A protein has these predicted regions:
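Cofactor-/ligand-binding subdomain signature composed of acidic, glycine-rich
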Residues: 1-42, 46
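Gly-rich Lys/Arg/Thr-decorated short loops/hinges at beta-loop-alpha junctions or inter-strand turns
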Residues: 31-39, 99-110, 222, 263
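Phosphate-interacting basic helix/loop segments used at nucleotide- and nucleic-acid interfaces
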Residues: 43, 50-55
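Glycine-rich phosphate/diphosphate-binding loops that line cofactor/substrate pockets in enzymes
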Residues: 53-64, 130-132
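Aromatic/hydrophobic pocket-lining residues that form π-stacking "cages" and hydrophobic walls in ligand
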Residues: 56, 152, 210
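Glycine-rich phosphate-binding loops that contact phosphosugars or nucleotide phosphates
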Residues: 68-206, 214-218
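Short, amphipathic alpha-helical interaction segments embedded in low-complexity terminal/linker regions
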Residues: 214-302
């Protein structure tokens, strides 16, 4: 007997696109753009819940814990994508934000049959990463019923983790399984059931908020500058200089000299220049300030 998906918003037909196969290219992209515009409005109704997830993630980081994103298919790929962007953007170890996709790395580029239907696989994946009560597990599923995600959330709760769920159906199974439900109703997809569209867009926006918000709360930004950016290519080398210039008002040569004196740390260079101290003292200030530049600048001379 097949699953009953008829009650899910993500599986219903969109009345605006019943004649999609008869539309011109311009009509297709116009209706898609109009439907996509509904996504931020739907997310706006979930902001308090998203903010709670940001708080929990930041608290986990402060305790030495990690943030796990779990999903299958598009949902899992989005979690892996957002997790992979954290080390170069925020200078954190790759183990700090982890994206788990049902079926493993292979599933990122091709479907792995049956993987999303296995609760046990989720438990194995979390155990392999040594899940602890200090971690936060966020389950992602547009349908809100993916067994892999449900298994991960149940195991995480047994360990004592905070758990959150991101779904695109109201009253979802994963929303009920998690401590915190982030359920966004984007309406039916332009192409019926193709949740890589509006649902995927909504998930990506929410994941951006959780990852960025929690990193900002733990000192990874000064003003709106990403002060822990890693200089892994020429563009980022220049961006690092620009960040120091924007934060301090110094000339490029002085910005580069400060970065070099700080061992490549943009955050330390900014603290040196604004607190008028050397790299060693700037590092001590930042340690005392738990990595927050604004607080480090205000500290008394050590």
């Amino acid at each position: 007997m097949g699953l009953n998906l008829s009650g899910m918003t993500t599986e219903t037909r969109n009345p605006r696109t019943m004649q999609l196969d008869q539309m011109s290219p311009l009509e297709i992209v116009t209706v898609m753009n109009e439907e996509d515009a509904r996504v931020p409005l739907a997310i706006a109704k979930c902001l308090p819940q998203i903010a709670q997830a940001v708080t929990w993630a930041a608290e986990s980081f402060e305790k030495g814990g990690r943030l796990f994103y779990m999903g299958a298919g598009t949902s899992g790929r989005l979690g892996v994508l957002v997790a992979a962007e954290c080390p170069p953007t925020f200078g954190v170890p790759k183990e700090m934000v982890v994206g788990l996709i049902a079926g493993g790395e292979k599933a990122f580029i091709e479907a792995v049959e049956g993987a999303e239907d296995s609760r046990e696989l989720a438990v194995e994946d979390l155990k392999a990463h040594g899940l602890t009560a200090n971690d936060l597990v966020v389950g992602i599923a547009a349908s809100g019923r993916t067994p892999y995600v449900l298994g991960g959330l149940d195991y995480a709760k047994s360990v004592g983790c905070h758990t959150a769920a991101i779904a695109c159906n109201i009253g979802s199974a994963i929303g009920k399984a998690a401590e915190l439900a982030i359920e966004v109703n984007c309406g039916p997809e332009v192409l019926t059931g193709s949740t890589r569209l509006k649902s995927g867009t909504a998930q990506k926006l929410i994941l951006n908020m959780i990852s960025t918000g929690s990193m900002v709360r733990t000192g990874k930004a000064y003003q709106n500058l990403m002060v822990d950016v890693q200089q892994t290519n020429e563009k980022l080398h220049t961006r690092a200089e620009n960040i120091v210039i924007d934060a301090t008002g110094v000339e490029r040569e002085k910005a580069r000299a400060a970065i070099d004196a700080a061992g490549g740390s943009v955050k330390t260079a900014i603290t040196m220049l604004l607190a008028d101290c050397d790299a060693k003292e700037a590092a001590r200030r930042l340690e005392r300030a738990r990595g927050h530049v604004r607080e480090a600048i205000r500290l008394e001379v050590l």
